[in-house]
Regions:
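Conserved active-site tyrosine of GNAT-family acetyltransferases
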Residues: 20, 116, 121
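C-terminal "cap" of GNAT-fold acetyltransferases
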Residues: 109-110, 129-144
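Conserved N-terminal entry element of GNAT/NAT acetyltransferase domains
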Residues: 1-11, 144
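Conserved GNAT acetyl-CoA-binding A-motif
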Residues: 96-109
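A conserved beta-turn-beta hairpin within the catalytic core of GNAT-like acetyltransferases
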Residues: 62-71, 80, 129-134
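Active-site rim helix/loop that mediates acceptor-substrate recognition in acyltransferases
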Residues: 21-54
Length: 144
């Protein structure tokens, strides 16, 4: 099975967390204590699979501003460059549109800002530190 699915079971959520830990905690050195947060239950989580194995994840939730906040986009290093990040973003943006959101916002690692810019996201504000990694806030309309 290949594709992106909405996480609907506890087992699939654990798989999504395993991808996040592999990318953010093990690979990038983000403290495990900040990887899981208070927004897990309210967020819609997505899981990318290749031959049934979890290779990527993302989530979206409604931000305080009312925009769709896309977060925790991660693809295992063994599957980067295969389009899974774009597929995860497509799924999150589509679900956000279905929920009535007309704008998406995200806090991108500066090293990934080009990926999001190619999808129509524009920088809003300056660089800031999150978990020891430089980030920038980016946003785009979802009606395009």
């Amino acid at each position: 099975m290949h594709g992106v699915e909405v996480v609907e079971t506890a087992a699939a959520f654990r798989e999504a967390l395993a991808v996040r830990y592999a990318v953010f905690v093990d690979e990038q050195g983000v403290p495990a204590s900040v990887e899981v947060d208070d927004h897990e239950a309210e967020a819609t989580h997505f899981l990318a699979r290749v031959d049934g194995a979890a290779v990527g994840t993302a989530r979206y939730r409604t931000a305080e501003s009312g925009a769709a906040k896309i977060e925790r986009v991660a693809v295992r290093d063994t599957h980067r460059g295969e389009g899974w990040g774009a597929r995860l973003m497509d799924a999150a943006e589509a679900r956000a549109r279905e929920a009535g959101h007309d704008r998406a916002v995200l806090d991108a690692q500066t090293s990934a800002a080009g990926f999001y810019a190619a999808r129509g996201y524009e920088r809003v504000g300056g660089v800031f530190d999150e978990a020891g990694i430089p980030h920038v806030t980016m946003e785009r309309p979802l009606d395009e």
